[in-house]
Curated annotation (Swiss-Prot):
Reactions catalysed according to its record: Fe(II)-heme o + 2 A + H2O = Fe(II)-heme a + 2 AH2
Organism: Bacillus cereus (strain ATCC 10987 / NRS 248)
Main location class: membrane
Cytoplasmic side: 1-6, 84-91, 143-159, 233-243, 293-311
Subunit structure: Interacts with CtaB.
InterPro entries: COX15/CtaA_fam (IPR003780), COX15/CtaA_HemeA_synthase (IPR050450), HemeA_Synthase_type1 (IPR023755)
Active site (catalytic residues): 58
Function of the molecule: Catalyzes the conversion of heme O to heme A by two successive hydroxylations of the methyl group at C8. The first hydroxylation forms heme I, the second hydroxylation results in an unstable dihydroxymethyl group, which spontaneously dehydrates, resulting in the formyl group of heme A.
Gene: ctaA
UniProt-recorded name of the protein: Heme A synthase
Membrane topology label: Multi-pass membrane protein
Positions bound to heme o: 61, 123
Length: 311
C-alpha cells in the first residue's frame, strides 16, 4: 500500500502543477469564457459541439482540476490513515483539500458571475497553497526528512524569522504577479528596470501595477540572497537549510530572468508559463522550510529535556 501511496503522491503533485499552469494558460490566452457562463457544463453541454481553441483550453483546465480533486481527496484519506504518526500529516491533508475546494469554487464563481481582477488574482494564490501542501505531504511520504536528518534540526530565531518572513512576503509577490496578469498589465512598461526610457515613473493604473510587482520582486530577490548567505555561513552542518536556501535563490533568480524576458519577448506564452512554474516551485521550497521551522522549536525543547535528564 505504501508503494501505491508514493505513486499517488507523485501523480497528484504533477496534476496540481498542471492545474496551476493551466490556470495561467487560461488567463494568458483569455480562455476564461471558453465554455461561456456555464459550469460545470461547457456552453450548456456535457460534451461541447463547437470546439474553439479557447473552449479546449478552458475545458482541459476544468478536467485536470476535477481529476486533481479526486486524487487529492484519495491522497488525503490514505495519508491520514497510514501516516497519521507524522505530526504534520493531518494539517497538510486538510490544507490540501480545503484550498483545492476553495480554488475550484472560486473558479466556478468567476465563470458564472465574473470577478474583478483584484479578486481573480487571489485564485492563483489559493491554488498555490494546495499545491505546496501536497508537495510537503509527498516529502513526508517519501521520508525526505530522514535523508536530510531534518528531525534533529534546530534553528536560531534569526533564521526562523527569515524563513517565515520570506514565505509570507512571497505570497504578496505572487498576488502582485497574478494581478499583473489579470489586469493585462504584462506589457504596460516596455522597458526594464524602469517603466520607460522617456517616462521612468508610472503614470496610469496598469503601469503602477506592473512597477509595483517589479519592486516587490526585487525585494524578495534581495531578501532570499541575504538568507542564503546566512545559511551558507552558519548552516553548513544542516544540509536541508543550507541547500533549501541555495535552491530558493536559484529559483528566484530564474524567476527574475524569466520575468525580464516576459517584457522583452512581448509576453510570450512560454515565458509566462515558466514564470508561473518557477514561482510555484519556489513557494513549495519555502513552505518546506517553514515546516522545518515549526519543528525546530519542538526539537529544541526535546533536546533541552534530554539534557536535563542526563544531568
Amino acid at each position: 500500500m505504501q508503494r501505491f501511496i508514493k505513486w499517488l503522491a507523485v501523480i497528484t503533485s504533477l496534476d496540481l502543477l498542471i492545474v496551476l499552469l493551466g490556470g495561467a494558460l487560461v488567463t494568458k490566452t483569455g480562455s476564461g469564457q471558453g465554455c461561456g457562463k456555464s459550469w460545470p457544463l461547457c456552453n450548456g453541454e456535457f460534451v461541447p459541439s463547437n470546439l474553439s481553441m479557447e473552449t479546449i483550453i478552458e475545458l482541459s483546465h476544468r478536467l485536470t482540476s476535477g481529476s486533481a480533486g479526486i486524487l487529492v481527496t484519495l491522497l488525503c484519506i490514505l495519508s491520514w490513515k497510514y501516516y497519521k504518526h507524522v505530526r504534520e500529516t493531518k494539517t497538510l491533508a486538510i490544507l490540501s483539500f480545503v484550498f483545492l475546494v476553495a480554488q475550484a469554487l472560486m473558479g466556478a464563481a468567476a465563470v458564472v458571475w465574473g470577478q474583478m481582477p483584484a479578486v481573480l488574482a487571489i485564485h492563483f494564490g489559493i491554488s498555490l497553497i494546495s499545491f505546496a501542501s501536497v508537495i510537503l505531504l509527498t516529502c513526508l511520504i517519501f521520508e525526505i526528512d530522514q535523508k536530510f536528518d531534518a528531525r534533529s534540526l534546530i534553528m536560531d530565531k534569526k533564521m526562523k524569522f527569515h524563513i517565515y518572513g520570506v514565505t509570507i512576503y512571497s505570497y504578496i509577490v505572487v498576488y502582485t504577479g497574478a494581478l499583473v496578469r489579470h489586469e493585462r498589465a504584462s506589457l504596460a512598461c516596455p522597458d526594464f528596470p524602469l517603466c520607460s526610457k522617456n517616462r521612468p515613473m508610472p503614470t496610469q493604473l496598469h503601469e503602477w501595477v506592473q512597477m509595483g510587482h517589479r519592486v516587490a520582486a526585487m525585494l524578495i530577490f534581495a531578501w532570499i540572497l541575504y538568507a542564503m548567505i546566512l545559511a551558507i555561513r552558519h548552516y553548513k552542518q544542516q544540509p536541508v537549510v543550507y541547500w533549501g536556501w541555495i535552491i530558493s535563490f536559484i529559483l528566484v533568480t530564474l524567476q527574475a530572468i524569466v520575468g525580464i524576458l516576459v517584457v522583452f519577448t512581448n509576453a510570450s506564452l512560454s515565458m509566462a508559463l515558466l514564470h508561473s512554474l518557477f514561482i510555484s516551485c519556489l513557494f513549495a521550497v519555502l513552505c518546506y522550510l517553514v515546516m522545518l521551522g515549526t519543528r525546530s522549536k519542538v526539537n529544541a525543547k526535546e533536546a533541552a529535556s534530554t539534557s536535563k535528564q542526563t544531568k
